[in-house]
Amino acid sequence: MRQKPIYVEIEMKSDLDTLWEYTQNPSLHKEWDLRFSNITYLNSQPCEKQKFLYETRVGFGLKVSGTGETVGVFNKCSSERSSSLAFGSDHPLSLIRHGSGYWKYIQRENGKMTFLTQYQYKTAYGLLGRWIDRLLFRPLLGWATAWSFDALRLWVEQNKHPKRFIRSAIIYVFMCLFFSLFWFYQGFAGVKTSILTGTAEIGLAILWLLPLKRKWIIHGVQACIFAGFACLGSEIFMWVLLSVFSAASGALSLQLPSARRTKRKRKK
């Protein structure tokens, strides 16, 4: 049951030195990477690999901690750099026991940077740990890496701090949950009078729970539906408010980082 390594690649407008600073400086790295709550570099000799401690908050006041070491390889005259790392944890809440990977930086002729990572790890807790990793943890970790890379891109390109996106993303999730519950309620109530209408409304409720690629289309269609209800003259204020709410949340979704803007498979 060997799993494929996690691979993420993104292109952004930047120069080599700037991107290197944003990713190799621990005080900046922890700001954009969802995988880490804190990164602390330990004292080391110039000829040694840089050792570090990391922490990740997992909720309910709990943290997972681990250690690692990294080394950067670059030539001032080259348009490429790389950074390798090894990491591990003996924390009882950590599903990762040890792993390794690398970051690679490639300066393109069009003034853009290609930033990519690939890493692999071994899990704890035997067969149970491997199944949890396969079904839940690895997909979530891959998504978090990809989302973080796009958050980094927006920070570098537009100077928008990643913490702002995290708050906005939480708000957006609650918006989607609100619309989903709204249509579930409408669907289960409406199915008594019209099975077709009730089923369609329940289907729309399910769509709000899915990570769809072009979800802004649903926002737009829903805003038009609410506006149409308002034109019918019944509870005008409520429908207008819901229409504006739907359009505003759609606009918000277009400004958020997205894992879909990254490449998750290496070119053959």
Swiss-Prot record:
GO terms for cellular component: plasma membrane. Keywords: Cell membrane, Membrane, Transmembrane, Transmembrane helix. It is found in: Cell membrane. The chain crosses the membrane at residues 169-189, 190-210, 225-245. It is a multi-pass membrane protein. Its main location: membrane. This is Uncharacterized membrane protein YndG. It comes from Bacillus subtilis (strain 168).
